[in-house]
Each structure stands twice: as C-alpha cells, then as structure tokens.
Swiss-Prot record:
Its main location: cytoplasm. This is UvrABC system protein C. One of its GO terms (molecular function) is excinuclease ABC activity. PANTHER family: UVRABC SYSTEM PROTEIN C, UVRC/OXIDOREDUCTASE. The UvrABC repair system catalyzes the recognition and processing of DNA lesions. UvrC both incises the 5' and 3' sides of the lesion. The N-terminal half is responsible for the 3' incision and the C-terminal half is responsible for the 5' incision. InterPro entries: GIY-YIG_endonuc, GIY-YIG_endonuc_sf, GIY-YIG_UvrC_Cho, RuvA_2-like, UVR_dom, UVR_dom_sf, UvrABC_protein_C, UvrC. It comes from the Bacteria. Belongs to the UvrC family. Interacts with UvrB in an incision complex. Residues 205-240 form the UVR domain. GO terms for biological process: nucleotide-excision repair; SOS response.
Length: 604
C-alpha cells in the first residue's frame, strides 16, 4: 500500500506484522500489532504517536506492507524473524557474538573436569555439558574458584592427570579428590560432580539436602573422612548463604535488564547473577530505534535468549511485557519467570541495571556522538543526520589522485562503508575532482543515501557540492563545509567557518564548540584515509615499476617471492623453475621470461 493512498479501511482489523519501506524498497521498520488498522492509523494522526523518531521515519516511508497472522504470539515470532532477515535500521537488531564465554564439562573423559571455554556453539551435546554464556572469562574463573572450594573436582590437564604418580597439593588442601591416583571411587567423584552441576544451575537447596544425606550415609558406613569432607562443604555453603542473605542475593540465577533511551540512542544492559553472585554486565547500544519500550525489550529478550543452553530462573524487566507465551518461547523445558517488580530487591536490581545503561550511554556513546542540540540550532532543522559522509581527496602535484569518503553511522565510524575513487581528470583540479567523486558516488546509488555530506573547504566547495547534487536531482541531503579562517592554517586552536543552508556565507565556530570538534574528527579521519589510499596507489603505480608484469597480480607475485626470496632472483629464474610455481600459467611464464629479456637488454 502506497502511503499517499492510505485510508483506514484498506487495513484489516486483524493481528499481523507491517513493514515500512522507502522509495528504493529497503525495509526501514518492522512492527507487530494486535489490530493492524488501529496501529498503522496512529502513524497518520498528528496526536497518534508521540515518539520523536516517528516524523523522520514517516518522511522516508513510501510504502507499507502488511502480513496477517492468527494471533499475537505468531505476530511476535514473525516480527522477530523478519527483523533478522531484513536488518531494518529502526529496529533493535542484536548482532550475534562471534564467541561466548562458557563453562564446559567434557563427558568423553572418565573423570570429567570443568573448563572455561570460548565457543560459538552454546548448546550442550552428548560429548559435553555447557553452562552460560557468561559476561567474561573473569566471571567464569570466579565461578570456578567457588566450585573448587566447595566441590573437590580435578583441575589438571588430561596430560598431567595421566602422568601423575602421587597426589598434588590440592589434595592436601582438601580441594581435589585425587582421582589421578585412585584415592576416590568413580561413584564418589560422580556424586561430587553432580552437586557442582546443581550449583551451576542455581539449585542450592537440593545441594544442601544431598550433602546432609551424604553425611548421614557416610557416618553410618563409618567413612568418617568422607563424612568430614561433606560436612566442611555443607558448612561453607551455609556460611555463604548467611552472608548472601544479608546482601540479598539468595543464590538465585537472575538476569536484570535495564533500558536507557535519550534522543536517538538506546542502551540495554543485562546484569547477570548466577548462583547468587553478581558476575557483571553486558551492554548493547542501538541507534535509530523507533520501537516502543515494550517492543524493544521483548524483541531484545527473544533474540538474546533464543538457543542459549540455559535461561536464568528469573528475568526482571523494567516494565511488564504483555506476551503470555514469551517464557515458553525462550525455553520450552524450564520457562523463566518474567516479572517487573515495583519494590524490594528486584526493583533495586532493575535500578542498578538502568544506572549501568545510563553510565554506558553517557561515557561510551555520547563521548563520540554528534552534539545534536548544537547542530539543530545552527541548521534550524529537527532532522537527525543518522548517516554522515565526509569527503576528501589526496594527490602528489596532481598525479595519483584519489577521492574518498568515510561514513559515520549509528553514532560510530563505519570503516566497512569507506570508499575510494581513482580520479581520472587529466589536468588535476580540486573542484573538478570533487565533482567527479560526488557524481560517481551517487550515480549508481549502490549504498544508502546519506543524511549529511561534510566537506573540508570553504564557500566555493560548498557551492560545488550543492550544484552537483542539484544536477543529480538529489534532495533532502544536508551539505556542510568547514574551513579554517583565511590566512590561518597553523596547528593552534582557532575559529573555523561553517557553511550550510542557513549560513551560506559562513558562521564562525569557536574551538570550544563541540560541533566543530566533532566535524574536525571526521575531517581528520577522512584526511587520514585519503592519504593512505593515495600512498597505496602511488606505491602500486610508481614505486614498483620493475615488478609490474602483465598477468602477474599480487597473489602470483607473492608466490614468486616466497619461492625466490627477492625480485632479483625471480629475474634469474629458469623456465623449469617457473613451471614449478603453482598457479602460474604458460602465458604467465612467457610474460616473466619476456620481462627478464627486457631487463637484460636495458642493462646492456
């Protein structure tokens, strides 16, 4: 449905999912609704949706697609799957961690031990039991230290275990059963391991009951040393429980989720409490998010906990989430309890999580973020520039000229989106080069259109950018140019002049201006990137002419140098030696031999 054709009657009053798209067909936002007609209609009413991101989203949206489902749960799952498929910029998308810190118990060894592992797969199998993921390797080691105090399992490597002739010092410290020299039975070791597993699952009451039964049984069988070991473990746990009760941690497995939002920034923080210990926090920053708080949280929770081997017993959220089936979607066997306490220890944890999220936002994101309030005053525009491209060029007296642009998106530099253009102008001219780069950048539109273009230059460069965009029929892109004051190109802190639509003649910004400092950082990064690309081009085109042979690219050149160690030796290689190099064709060998003959002729 085209946005200009919208009438409420066109939208069914049914549960479903809607996709908001721009003119190129890119999906900008995906939402779900119990009643699609009511939900979509709010976007078209002035008093319908007060979120500050919505006007900007609607300005870019040209088409809305709807998908009907049977119920709200189906809508929730479909929304999550479509977000993963399309990666819309205005939704929360949790990027997959490459690896996770976990604790693993290998079941392939007769006497298993618990190890800290870093793995992509966080699911248990027949070969190993996985616990986690945890926030860091340090958190894993903290848990291992507690386990070694309470449950005397082996910690040595398999090689050391096999070579042991007598017990190590850990046995003397009552922190290992010494299975390496058969000082315990397999049954006794397995019982201790089972208790450690219960501990990792947070089932402390079951451990206490098992220990009490084990003490009684060992005493009846007159195994007093074994009974003493169980008694010491029980006392350690009981003492810790008393201490933790005062600290209100209660040996539970809990995740507390904090949410902080300001302007276009969203940070979600997960506080991880395992077996009563606060192990740390993980922070997930997002930008350009247009979802409501409840949708942000439910979408995040489904992505974060799906496919994890264990979910905590409780997940605390700052606001109630009205999705009845969500716990069972996270874990069918042992669904976690989702609750939003208003008072007590749970609320204290939630406040702590929110404070952590706020601190992370203020110290990490905002330290490098665009000073939006100052920009809004100067540009007289409420639109937030989500994507900024900064342009620069580099050359050596007009030769080996390159033009580049760098990208600042989602409140961070995005090096994967940086681009380089070899400038083809025969007689180099700054304005002509800039016109060429800008034209080539936008003529194919293979990447997202920026909200703002930043240029290092004065009024002339600013006017050239505006003229080029007009020739390309591109509207809605803010153009900003910054230049040092006339006659001042020293490294000292001086005012700089900013040119934009509201100040085409320029406005002076003092060196203390946060906006100027932000633009200067982007300009410096663009300049660094332009110089590096120029030097690479110069090195390739000018500094190594002797090594240029038709058909011999970088890979084949490396193979030749690996074999012959230097280019001089390559130029002395025989045809038979060249034929032994993998990947060289007959034609390549002919080119190398021709180059050898050419160099010999020139030397003569």
């Amino acid at each position: 449905m085209r946005v200009e054709d919208f009438t409420p009657k066109l939208i069914p009053a049914s549960p479903g999912v809607y996709l908001m798209k721009d003119s190129s067909g890119e999906v900008l936002y995906i939402g779900k609704a119990k009643n699609l007609r009511n939900r979509i209609s709010t976007y078209f009413r002035k008093d319908g949706d007060s979120r500050e991101r919505i006007p900007f989203l609607m300005k870019k949206t040209t088409d809305i697609e709807t998908i009907l489902v049977s119920n709200e749960t189906e809508a929730f799952l479909l929304e999550n799957n479509l977000i993963k498929k399309y990666h819309p910029k205005y939704n929360v998308l949790l990027k997959d961690d490459k690896t996770f810190f976990c604790l693993a118990i290998s079941l392939t060894h007769l006497w298993p031990k618990i190890d800290v592992v870093r793995t992509k797969a966080v699911t248990s199998s027949k070969k190993q039991i996985i616990f986690g993921p945890y926030v860091s390797a340090e958190a894993c080691r903290t848990l291992l230290e507690v386990i070694s105090q309470w449950f005397p399992l082996r910690t040595c490597s398999n090689r050391e275990f096999a070579s042991r002739k007598r017990p190590c010092i850990l046995y003397e410290m009552k922190r290992c059963l010494a299975p390496c020299v058969n000082l315990c039975s397999h049954e006794e070791y397995e019982q201790t391991l089972d208790k450690a597993v219960l501990f990792l699952k947070g089932q402390i009451s079951e451990i206490v009951q098992d220990l009490e039964k084990s003490i009684e049984k060992a005493s009846k069988e007159q195994k007093f040393e074994q009974a003493g070991m169980y008694y010491r473990t029980l006392k350690l746990i009981q003492q810790a429980m008393e201490k933790q009760h005062v600290e209100k941690f209660h040996f539970q497995n809990i995740d507390a989720i904090g949410l902080y939002r300001k302007y276009q920034k969203t940070v979600i923080t997960v506080l991880t409490i395992r077996s009563g210990k606060l192990l740390g926090a993980r922070h997930f920053p997002f930008s350009e998010n247009a979802q409501e708080d409840a949708d942000v949280l439910s979408s995040f929770i489904l992505q974060y906990y799906t496919n994890q081997p264990q979910t905590p017993k409780e997940i605390l959220t700052p606001i109630p989430l009205n999705i009845p089936d969500l716990p069972s979607l996270l874990n069918k066997d042992t669904p976690p309890q989702l609750r939003s306490p208003k008072t007590g220890y749970g609320r204290e944890l939630l406040n702590l999580a929110k404070n952590n999220a706020q601190v992370h936002a203020e110290t990490t994101i905002q330290s490098s973020a665009l000073p939006y309030e100052e920009l809004k005053k100067i540009l007289k525009s409420p639109d937030y520039p989500y994507r900024i491209e900064c342009y620069d060029n580099a050359h050596l007296q007009g030769s080996h000229a390159v033009g580049v642009y760098i990208v600042y998106e989602n409140d961070a530099l995005s090096p994967k989106d940086y681009r380089t253009f070899s400038i083809s102008s025969s007689a180099y001219n700054d304005l002509a080069a800039f016109h060429e780069v800008l034209s080539r950048r936008f003529i194919s539109l293979t990447s997202s259109i920026p909200d703002m273009i930043l240029i290092d230059g004065g009024r002339t460069q600013y006017a050239q950018a505006k003229k080029t965009l007009k020739e390309l029929n591109l509207t809605g892109i803010q153009v900003v140019s910054i230049a040092k004051e006339a006659g001042n190109h020293s490294g000292s802190l001086k005012n700089e002049k900013l040119f934009c639509d509201t100040f085409p003649q320029g406005v002076l910004l003092p060196p203390t201006s946060k906006l100027l400092q932000f633009f200067q950082k982007l300009r410096d990064e663009a300049h660094r990137f332009a110089l590096s690309r120029h030097r690479k081009k110069r090195h390739k085109d000018f500094l190594l002419p002797k090594e240029k042979i038709p058909g011999i690219g970088e890979i084949k050149r490396k193979r030749l140098l690996q074999k012959f160690k230097s280019w001089e030796q390559v130029m002395k290689a025989s045809q038979g030696e060249l034929e032994a190099i993998p990947g060289l064709t007959k034609k390549d060998i002919q080119h190398v031999l021709a180059k050898q003959a050419e160099d010999t002729y020139l030397e003569d």
